[in-house]
């Protein structure tokens, strides 16, 4: 939604701006939640302020910094325990605003001719690279299973954000276009680089699989 004048309101904040529609709701809060034992009953959440348009330009940098801090505090060399990180960057869920650094890459000369989506992907890649670099600095990169995927098919109602060819349906449907998504996994010594697997896998199985690999109960 694009911030636009609305009768009776002097200011309409928003967190996304694909230049279509009008924001009728305030921006979402950014919550930082912790739990000493991983249970919801003992969870506390801190409101770190609204995800405004301006903040959305660098919110992924905030998220990656928190992930890196978590990794530092949970380094197995310090804790003698495995760690689990569920890292959810804002990219490429929807077209958030670009910071000056990435705005400068739009239409970049030299054959790239990047648009908003390509530049957003670059920002996401950079932040994932920071997390992988932290794992490498910890000496854990080759001892960590890294999975990269998405939660649903493309939201085709907001074309041209994505497509689902050759599948039927899209986000908010239970057709393959809404449920079947690509996935990449990195597990040195177990998954050969460049391997392609066309088998269907339910992401519901990931958590028990990872727990089992880490030595937890089956």
Label each PLM-derived region with a short phrase.
Residues 54, 58-61, 65-69, 76:
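Metal-dependent phosphoester/phosphodiester hydrolase catalytic core
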Residues 90-94, 152-155, 174, 189-191:
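Solvent-exposed loop/turn segments at secondary-structure junctions
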Residues 2-4, 44, 129-138, 162-218:
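Substrate-binding rim/cap in mid-to-C-terminal beta-strand-loop elements of soluble/periplasmic
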Residues 47, 67-117, 155, 161-164:
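Active-site His/acidic residue clusters
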Residues 45-61, 108-123:
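The substrate-binding groove and active-site-proximal loops of carbohydrate-active enzymes
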Residues 79-82, 86-89, 123-159:
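Metal-dependent active-site segment of extracytoplasmic phospho-/sulfohydrolases and closely related
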Residues 58-65, 115, 122-129, 201-208:
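A structural signal for well-ordered alpha-helical segments within the folded catalytic domains
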Residues 1-45, 94-98, 157-181:
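Core domains of carbohydrate- and sulfate-ester-processing enzymes
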């Amino acid at each position: 939604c694009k911030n636009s004048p609305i009768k009776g309101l002097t200011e309409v904040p928003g967190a996304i701006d694909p230049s279509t529609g009008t924001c009728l709701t305030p921006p979402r809060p950014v919550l930082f939640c912790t739990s000493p034992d991983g249970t919801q009953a003992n969870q506390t959440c801190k409101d770190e302020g609204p995800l405004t348009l301006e903040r959305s330009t660098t919110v992924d940098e905030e998220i990656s910094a928190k992930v890196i801090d978590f990794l530092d505090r949970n380094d197995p060399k310090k804790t003698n325990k495995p760690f689990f990180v569920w890292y959810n960057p804002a990219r490429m869920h929807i077209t958030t605003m670009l910071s000056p650094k990435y705005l400068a890459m739009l239409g970049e000369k030299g054959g790239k001719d990047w648009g908003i989506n390509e530049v957003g992907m670059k920002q996401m890649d950079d932040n994932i690279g920071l997390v992988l670099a932290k794992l490498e600095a910890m000496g854990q990169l080759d001892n960590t299973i890294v999975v990269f995927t998405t939660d649903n098919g493309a939201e085709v109602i907001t074309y041209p954000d994505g497509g689902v060819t050759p599948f039927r349906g899209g986000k908010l449907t239970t057709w393959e276009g809404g449920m079947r998504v690509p996935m990449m996994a990195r597990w040195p010594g177990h998954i050969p680089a460049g391997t392609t697997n066309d088998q269907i896998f339910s992401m519901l199985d990931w958590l028990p699989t990872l727990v089992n690999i880490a030595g937890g109960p089956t």
